[in-house]
Amino acid sequence: MTKPQGIAVLGATGSVGCNTLDVVARHPERYRVVALTAHRQLDKLFEQARRFCPDYLVVADADAAARLRARLAEAGLRSEVLHGADALVQVAALPEVDAVMASIVGAAGLPSALAAARAGKRILLANKESLVVAGRLFMDAVRASGSALLPVDSEHSAIFQSLPADYAGNPDGAGVRKIILTASGGPFRNRPAADLAHVTPDEACRHPNWSMGRKISVDSATLMNKGLEVIEARWLFNVPPSRIEVAVHPQSVIHSMVQYRDGSVMAQLGSPDMRTPIACALAWPERIDAGVEPMDFFSLSDLTFEKPDLERFPCLQLAFDALEMGGDAPAVLNAANEVAVAAFLAGRLRFVDIPRVVAASLSGVSCAASDSLEGLLARDEEARRFAEGGVAAC
């Protein structure tokens, strides 16, 4: 019998992490959970530990680790508890780990994802910031180690499935004309521009189609999420920005498309359920049950497409601008956006000021290219400080 794959789920208590464990639980003969990590949600992590009995658990700090150890001991569970950023890097590169679900939100997920790449792991990439912040560095590590990189974002999974199996980062050789990323348009697609100044965090977090965490829900509402996905697609598929297009598709049935030179368009369709791309990445090239109901085509409404409104939602254009600027501009964009979104969720910044803080940061922070992880993290910190000043000035 084939030995089960060892899985580390980084960001286990978030939306993607929970969905990953839902899929894994359906296939105990295929997967063994080696490590689970969480930032704040200790209760949820404890329940996951009871169910999956991982070898390692990682939490943010020593206090959280001590509290978790006490609960595990009381329950008779033997998972080893580690803490801190170095522990995330450690479990991502463990010899007994075959695949790493990289689903920590934001730039905080970069060091552990990069460690998995350097260790030659099969990387299930949900942390798009790894490529936004460190695209060249990350892809160089993947190539050097022979790591397998499989996208988990529904759009990039759709592109991956719509490209030839031997694509190998060669769009011209594969006859690719362009990549078309679809976007739902978010909860404010039809909201008058004048009303956007009064948007509340709770409104921004109510996505019309997908169930997601609060940060990514706000990014979806501003279209920054789609902008980050454009940058991610550039690195994943080695396609220049001029050959990446965004189409607003409110029904979220077509998850993305590839247009070929001969006029053909290949698309991947499915219900808006993250378990589908997660299962695809976990088992590729095989297909496994994800617990997702089959799509009923006869119950679908019309499938419609619109151009994105870049005046009302300038974050998407800012992402294209950062790609064109090159260097560390995408890292600056991401850092400033994380600061601005956190301020918005905390009630310190208006929704319409998020792109203003990001634009000011792109203009005010040096975007000269860094050639190391340490340099990129220093640029990230510089951009965060600048953006905090921008938030205070709004």
Swiss-Prot record:
InterPro entries, per database record: DXP_reductoisomerase, DXP_reductoisomerase_C, DXP_reductoisomerase_N, DXPR_C, DXPR_C_sf, NAD(P)-bd_dom_sf
Catalytic reaction(s) noted: 2-C-methyl-D-erythritol 4-phosphate + NADP(+) = 1-deoxy-D-xylulose 5-phosphate + NADPH + H(+)
Amino-acid positions noted as binding 1-deoxy-D-xylulose 5-phosphate in the UniProt annotation, renumbered to this chain: K128, S154, E155, S184, H207, S220, N225, K226, E229
One record GO biological process: isopentenyl diphosphate biosynthetic process, methylerythritol 4-phosphate pathway involved in terpenoid biosynthetic process
Keywords: Isoprene biosynthesis, Manganese, Metal-binding, NADP, Oxidoreductase
Pfam families linked to this entry: DXP_redisom_C, DXP_reductoisom, DXPR_C
GO molecular function, one term: manganese ion binding
Binding locations of NADPH: T13, G14, S15, V16, R40, Q41, N127, E129, G213
Top-level lineage group: Bacteria
NADP among keywords: yes
Function: Catalyzes the NADPH-dependent rearrangement and reduction of 1-deoxy-D-xylulose-5-phosphate (DXP) to 2-C-methyl-D-erythritol 4-phosphate (MEP).
Family the UniProt entry places it in: Belongs to the DXR family.
PANTHER family for the chain: 1-DEOXY-D-XYLULOSE 5-PHOSPHATE REDUCTOISOMERASE, 1-DEOXY-D-XYLULOSE 5-PHOSPHATE REDUCTOISOMERASE, CHLOROPLASTIC
Stated name of the protein: 1-deoxy-D-xylulose 5-phosphate reductoisomerase
Phylogenetic lineage: Bacteria, Pseudomonadati, Pseudomonadota, Betaproteobacteria, Neisseriales
